[in-house]
């Protein structure tokens, strides 16, 4: 796996775990927490949403779904 792909997957996993820990979060909170651009956060959230791991109950807010996930390192 390419280093850039590995870095992206690690970041997406971190974003998911942050949302799971905090409950409902805003896109801006994620930008502030991870120090990356809003567009990058949006891409990461789209990957998570596509896999039914997060959803947006209202514009700019995100929470995890009830789907069970096994997190590995």
Swiss-Prot record:
Alphabetized PROSITE patterns for the sequence: HTH_DEOR_2
Pfam families in the record, alphabetically?
HTH_DeoR (PF08220)
Which UniProt keywords are listed? DNA-binding, Repressor, Transcription, Transcription regulation
Domain called HTH deoR-type: residue spans? 8-63
Q: Which InterPro entries match?
A: DeoR_HTH, WH-like_DNA-bd_sf, WH_DNA-bd_sf
Any one Gene Ontology molecular-function term assigned to this protein's record: DNA-binding transcription factor activity
- Induction record: By disulfide stress.
User: From the record, what ranges are coiled-coil?
Assistant: none
Taxonomically, the superkingdom here is Bacteria
**Known DNA-binding region:** 25-44
Q: State what protein this is by name.
A: Uncharacterized HTH-type transcriptional regulator YtzE
Species name: Bacillus subtilis (strain 168)
